[in-house]
Amino acid sequence: MDYKLVIFDCDGVLVDSEAIGNRFISEALTLAGIPISAEGALSQFLGGKLTQIKEDAEKQLGFSLPSNWVDEIYKKQFSEFRKNLKSIDGIEDVLDVLERINIPVCVGSNGPLNKMEVSLGVTKLRDRFLGRIFSADQVKKPKPAPDLYLYCADRMGVPPQHCLVIEDSPRGASAGVAAGMSVFGYSGGEDNSALKEVGCTKVFDTMQEIATFLDN
């Protein structure tokens, strides 16, 4: 194991936010005229960027959504995060192992920095990544393009081939693979076939399994 940097996706890897976030996306899309369940939104948009979801919806609808459409969804998400958001079970174990074996960590998410400020703050994970939280807003193209993960590696001063990405979505895992990095898929016990198909080095059901693997 020759990892010199571990890059974590945020939603669904560090914080258990995907179900909460996609509930409000499904409500907003249904109201706009694109009926979709929370489960459907989670399946379709996992790891996606909200501004891109808005653009795709506008193409499907044939008209523009309100300019504050994205901001209103974030406002609802943030309110719910502050009340109910939890960290992913076992993520502290992974971070503890990496700290003990002196492998640096950072965050690379398609979400905006202010969203991570809320989600990582609420779950008390922010201090573990101070100054090392990066967003797709800082690069030209979001995941599944490799731009963000290459940016993370550059900012952290580590060659891509020595980076490990931990992802829960095929979209994000594809970005890590395209960047020339090793990628661990985290399935949370759900169907992991899509993560395997995009080229994850390994796929794990739990964070405890990842912690044990890294500790050996």
Language-model features: locations:
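Short glycine-rich loop/turn motifs that provide flexible caps or phosphate-binding loops at active sites
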Residues: 11, 46-47, 107, 171, ...
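Short glycine/serine/threonine/alanine-rich loop segments
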Residues: 34, 63, 103, 158, ...
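Short beta->alpha linker loops
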Residues: 45, 49, 73, 86-90, ...
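A generic structural signal for short
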Residues: 13-14, 42-43, 82-83, 104-105, ...
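Conserved SAM-binding loop
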Residues: 14, 87, 105-108, 165-166, ...
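Asp-based, Mg2+/Mn2+-dependent phosphohydrolase catalytic module
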Residues: 1-4, 96, 112-216
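N-terminal helical cap/lid subdomain that shapes the substrate entry/recognition surface
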Residues: 2-100
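A generic short-segment signal for beta-strand/edge and adjacent turn/coil regions
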Residues: 11-12, 21-23, 63, 73-76, ...
